[in-house]
Amino acid sequence: MIYAGILAGGTGTRMGISNLPKQFLELGDRPILIHTIEKFVLEPSIEKIVVGVHGDWVSHAEDLVDKYLPLYKERIIITKGGADRNTSIKKIIEAIDAYRPLTPEDIVVTHDSVRPFITLRMIQDNIQLAQNHDAVDTVVEAVDTIVESTNGQFITDIPNRAHLYQGQTPQTFRCKDFMDLYGSLSDEEKEIWTDACKIFVIKGKDVALAKGEYSNLKITTVTDLKIAKSMIEKD
């Protein structure tokens, strides 16, 4: 089976324009989270869309699904997320297992709730690549020069931009593989390796690159929200 895992566990309100976490802010005529879920609803091969949210916001997320996606709510599971990204993925996979016991071939397409401009093509590319690889990471080519500094004051390296990509989401992999790899980490490693695909890479697994889009914006600041609103208005 193929599942989607939407990471919506953040509680940050640092935009300073609302008491709502950013995934619940309005973008056009509906919340950011709803825009994101809608993109996954369009892919018929996805059995369930599991949304991991902070425990304080589970009821709110369920109410939004009832209001904006009543025809699809049977395909959507709202579950309590974890304290960080990878524990949220773990909670999402546990919710999948509760729905239907996991098999070795079950795949989860994980995605940031605050990237509402994901395309169906990106979702389908992730699913296709995951059939033949251990994991898939969605990326775009680095446009700006990337500068490395180990102390925040002086440049220590300027890597060759031709070899660099900017990571986005989705990130896709088999549910059991993630659970096994994550479970093998020490507590210290879990704190350091916060990116799921990095765990696969460090453990020597095959991680394929899927082509992202520069429009696959992650809305984390007021400026991002302004850009997103402009993009919605143009559509």
Curated annotation (Swiss-Prot):
Top-level enzyme category: transferase
Binding site for CTP: 7-10, 82-88, 113
Enzyme Commission number(s): 2.7.7.40
Sites marked Positions ribitol 5-phosphate for the nucleophilic attack: 161, 218
UniProt cross-references to InterPro entries, sorted A to Z: IspD/TarI, IspD/TarI_cytidylyltransf_bact, ISPD_synthase_CS, Nucleotide-diphossugar_trans, TarI
Entry keyword Transmembrane: no
Pathway participation: Cell wall biogenesis; poly(ribitol phosphate) teichoic acid biosynthesis
A Gene Ontology molecular function term of the record: 2-C-methyl-D-erythritol 4-phosphate cytidylyltransferase activity
Disulfide bonding pattern of the chain: none
Alphabetical UniProt keywords: Cell wall biogenesis/degradation, Nucleotidyltransferase, Teichoic acid biosynthesis, Transferase
Enzymatic reactions: D-ribitol 5-phosphate + CTP + H(+) = CDP-L-ribitol + diphosphate
GO biological process terms, semicolon-separated: cell wall organization; isoprenoid biosynthetic process; poly(ribitol phosphate) teichoic acid biosynthetic process
Family: Belongs to the IspD/TarI cytidylyltransferase family. TarI subfamily.
Function per UniProt: Catalyzes the transfer of the cytidylyl group of CTP to D-ribitol 5-phosphate.
Name by which UniProt lists this protein: Ribitol-5-phosphate cytidylyltransferase
Lineage, top ranks: Bacteria, Bacillati, Bacillota, Bacilli, Lactobacillales
